[in-house]
Amino acid sequence: MAVSKNEAQSRIQINKMLELSGWDLDIDSEKRNVEVEYPTPSGREADYVLLDKNGFPLCVLEAKNFEIDPLIAKEQARDYANELNCRFIILSNGREHYFWDIETGNPNTIS
């Protein structure tokens, strides 16, 4: 799926956030644990999927552009998480970030 200019700018911020948090997005790295545009069984693509130490999906990260409240992607991200058997979701527009454990409640703001 094509990414808008604003969403691309948001993704730059999200990439920085992930790297500062210890996640590896380098496609040439053997330690890479983040996949971008990760295919789901239904044929759709999750913006990002964070992988566990065994390479299995752990968390779906849905990216939106700066101008959009990331919470609008809540149901879309839940669909991806369910398809990929992920318990955790991050919703972000590069400025606002929410963490959601779909087994225990609603998204919470993170910084």
Describe each region flagged by the PLM:
Residues 1-111:
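Accessory nucleic-acid engagement/destabilization modules that flank
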